[in-house]
């Protein structure tokens, strides 16, 4: 695993994509778009109002958690872990937590597991998991 320290969160694009400035060391940093690995969240920019509502909720949750965090690390499998759209694919770790925030989003009903195949759209399941979670 490769680790990159986030110096600054520039923008939360949606529930599974963020723009960040990462520290490469020696006072060198780079701005990158990061896609959270292994998850898919409801879209926040869609005409489907039920999906949009859930998508905006997870976007706001992610924004809030990033603002609260004192340490943000992106972990990747390879030094250049970019996906087909040029985004870095990585696991988000907040405040030195061993479990990634990606996994937390799945466990609490804010995201589905995603391996790059067919996307899920079972919003009812997400709502049930959210109601049961304490996030």
Model-derived features: positions:
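Small beta-barrel nucleic-acid-binding modules, primarily SNase/OB-fold domains
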Residues: 1-135
């Amino acid at each position: 695993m490769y680790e990159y320290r986030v110096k600054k969160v520039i923008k939360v694009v949606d529930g599974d994509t963020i723009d960040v400035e990462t520290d490469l060391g020696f006072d060198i940093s780079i701005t990158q778009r990061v896609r959270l690995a292994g998850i898919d969240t409801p879209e926040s920019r869609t005409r489907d109002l039920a999906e949009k509502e859930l998508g905006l909720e997870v976007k706001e949750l992610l924004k809030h958690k990033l603002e609260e965090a004192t340490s943000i690390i992106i972990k990747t499998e390879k030094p250049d872990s970019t996906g087909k759209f040029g985004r870095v694919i990585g696991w988000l770790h907040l405040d030195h937590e061993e479990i990634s925030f990606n996994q937390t989003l799945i466990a609490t009903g804010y995201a589905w597991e995603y391996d790059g195949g067919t996307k899920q759209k079972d919003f009812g399941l997400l709502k049930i998991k959210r109601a049961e979670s304490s996030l």
